[in-house]
Amino acid sequence: MKIPKLLLPAVVVIGVIVFQSLFIVQEINQAIVLQFGDPKKIITKAGLNFKLPFIQNVVFLDKRILNLDNDPQEVIAADQKRLIVDAIARFKIVDPLKFYISVGNERVARSRLSTIINSRIRGVLGTQELATLLSTDRTKQMAIIQNDVNTEAKTLGIQIVDVRIKRADL
C-alpha cells in the first residue's frame, strides 16, 4: 500500500502546530500568555495549557520565595558613626500581571527592590544611634523597614516576606 506524498508533510505540519499550541506550567511557576506583547491570560495553577500557535507566547514567572542579597552599603547613624550594612531580603511575586507590566522580568525587579531596600535601610537606621542598632530593638527596625518596603513593592506586584541585616560592621 502506497502512502500519498502529501500525507507525511501534512502530518509533520499538524504535529508542529499541536506542539506549538501546548505548554506546561510547572508547580513552581505562574505564566502570562501574551498576544503580540499584550497580556491575555494569567495562569497560576500547574498543568497543561493551550495557546494560539505563532500568535501567542508565554512568559513564566517564579512562584517561590526568592532571595535578594544587597551589596553592602554605608549608613551614618544618628550619633554620626559610620556603619557598613549588608542586608538580605526575601520576596515573592504575588500579582504576575502587575509585575510584568511594571518591571518585566526578575532582573529589573531585583534592581528596583535593591534600590528601595537600600533607601529604606538608610532612612530608618540613620535615625537610630549605634547602641540601638546593636540591641534587641533591631527586630523592630527590621519590621519598620519591611513594612515600608512592602508598601512600595506592592506597586510592582511583589510582596516582601522578610528583610534582615546579615552583617553590620563599623
Residue ranges and their predicted role:
Residues 79, 85, 91, 109-170:
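Amphipathic, coiled-coil-like alpha-helical scaffolding segments used for oligomerization/assembly
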Residues 24-36:
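Membrane-proximal juxtamembrane linkers immediately C-terminal to transmembrane helices
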Residues 2, 39-40, 114:
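Membrane-proximal alpha-helical signals and transmembrane carboxylates
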